[in-house]
Amino acid sequence: RHPHRLDKLGGTCLHRGCIPTKALLHAAEVADSSRESAHFGVNTTLHGIDMVKVNEYRDGVVGRLYKGLQGLVKSRNVTYVEGAGRLVSPNTVEVNGEQYTGTNVVLATGSYARSLPGLDIDGRIMTSDQALNLNYVPKRVIVLGGGVIGVEFASVWRSFGSQVTIIEALPNLVPNEDIACSKALERAYRKRGINL
């Protein structure tokens, strides 16, 4: 876990991972559909991407799910304690000076975007956290890393009109996935004009 950040209920996936990126992917799909609408006899024109509205949509999706999760936790009588926890024994966690004991303790600390030594995260170079909150569509983007998060951002930005290049050190995109899936994704991305 990043030492300076405490997540809200729902953690990385809900607030700065899976869910917000899927909302961006949906907006990107809508942009692609509008470009291809003439194939279906629907005449429409894409006049651009309003990132303020896209981000409002993303935040609305996250907000609704967060509210639903809070309601679910409450309805199931789950005790939710906000704060930094510390394992003080095999079955006891201390948070804010209070100790909580259970038969089993699950350590689910979430994740955070990493940087590389010597790189300044300054806006021009950014982590996925900053990329998730961009208020503009970049003209050109280099995505360093062809894992799941990298290929999702590459797809979104290409759909929004950016020139995109993915740099992956391993032989294939999404290297943890089946090679046939990886090859199919690479073909699809090349066809869309994403450079690998």
List each language-model region with its residue ranges.
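Beta1/beta-strand and adjacent pyrophosphate-binding region of the FAD-binding site
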Residues: H2, V137-I149
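Glycine-rich flavin
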Residues: R5-V137, T165, L170-V174, D178-L196
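Structured core elements
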Residues: V143, E152, T165-I166
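Short beta-strand element of Class I
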Residues: R1, Q163-V164
